[in-house]
Amino acid sequence: MMLPSRRSLLAGAAGAALTSACASTVEPPTDAAARMNAILDRRVAESLRRSPERCTSLGLTEERAGYRFIDKMSDASKQAARESRAELRAALADLRAVDRDALSARDRVTYDVVTTAWENGLATSAFDIGGGAGSPYVVTQLTGAYTNGPDFLDAQHPLRTRDEADAYLARLGEYARQLDQETAIIGEDAAASVIAPDFAIDRALVQLNAFTSRSPRDTVLVQTLVRRLPSVADLSEADRNSLIARAESAVRDAVMPAYQRQIDALRAVRPRAVHDAGVWRLPRGADMYAAALRSRTTTTLSPDEIHNMGVALIAEFNAEMDTILRAEGMTRGTVAQRVQELSRRADQLYPNTDAGREQILADLNAQTRAIEALMPQAFNTLARARLEIRRVPPYTEAGAPGGYYQRAALDGSRPGAYYINLRDTGEWPRFTLPTLNYHEGVPGHHWQISIQQESGAIPFIRSAMLGFSAFSEGWGLYAEQLADELGVYANNRLGRLGYLQSATFRASRLVVDTGMHHKRWSREQAIQSMMQATGDLESSVTTEIERYCVWPGQACSYMVGRQAINRIRDNARQRLGARFDLKAFHDTMLANGAVPLTVLEQIMTDWATAL
């Protein structure tokens, strides 16, 4: 998965566009395309100014971003979100005034993509809580500046010059300010009866306290400088020591107190927190979930339709797993019970030690090299960006998902990376690892996003700025299936079992997400449902279920997207017969960037019709 922050949810769904330069002023438009491009350029300037972190993540220059951003962090206040929403509303009104019929076919795709993104962004942010309908609680075990700020500063802030080192120190102060802004929102939302579930608050408190229990010197915020400053050529040893001392002071005097204020705020609302898992309990909860589902899936499927899709797919995948397990001589018990038994087998377990974790990373890298060699069989266009596989930082692993992807910088200065949560190697039996690799790396998120960013044929908004979970996560699941179709499991029957278990897991997500947020299931009911469907360990299932509680609808995007891609592929194959070219199908899909599923279907129908 690709892990969002509160601010990126608004920026990604409602966010920016760029067709030429990020100028603050544009020439008067002379036709429909020019009018549209002017609107998009204006909006990107607004959006990038509101997200210095996005500018850094994309590797933009100050000239392209339109301002100096390297020493700034975004405004996390509710007022800033309201101002951004007003800007977006104005941009959408202007875009709707453009004559779509006067645009070229390519520009009509951009018009449809951006319009859908902005409409969804306004719909989800209209509830004026947390990060919107898809992330209703500002601080949980997965949301809040404390979850992504340290990782951003450690992994994405550049440290190549003295100026960038000074900017890092400035960002420490900005980070403390973000924490306080989100602490204020905890109280504001609580006054509106929007409080995270008790277990989400408890997990957040564990992680916040883990940070404050360290000395400033031992936090990742200071250790980043200790580790990286020696490579800055124009710094003397005295300069390095001075910068590290200043960072320690900033953490001690600004960041740590901000953490403590956030801890105090969560403790203050904790007695009012309930154990109910779904957003149905919140004011306008049903409307909120409907908006989240529309945004996440880019469809009009109802919660009941999505729930029933999941039930049917679980039955299909379980039948295939049963066949493999019987071939392994495992015939007693349910499919889930037999998968659990296999997960505990000594030959499937890595040592729960640092050496065991290093072996997991080594095995994943070997699998990546093997699948990369097969990519010319399925694609004409190959991704160029490098991929690194990393461990989820220990300071966030308690509440982090099993894996997530971080895209490469546009300028190539930072490779793509996916993170695997290695808090307990027992959660990763050997047979489960390959399909994770294919989902997050090649031919999954890394492959799809790298080709999207490297494409010169689509506007910047569609190659780097906008995101659609149903497309990107649907592609991730389709990539798992594609790896199977390419024969990676020909001599690895248990690896294919892992793929089918993963597919079952994603189908189960449809059931439990709609179960909790629409059918009012409890957290415990959802945990039992997923364990019975997948055979996964209770610890890993619990982390997943608690994730769906705070990101309503997001888990549905995966399988809804996969099923849509398969349906579109089947339709194209049926229409074209012997003329169907899988490589061309994939190239066309990815070259057009992440798009809503409705737009994807039209793009691929037009492609097939034109052949």
Question: How does the language model describe each region?
Answer:
Residues 23-611:
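N-terminal maturation segment of proteins
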Residues 2-3, 8-25:
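N-terminal export signals
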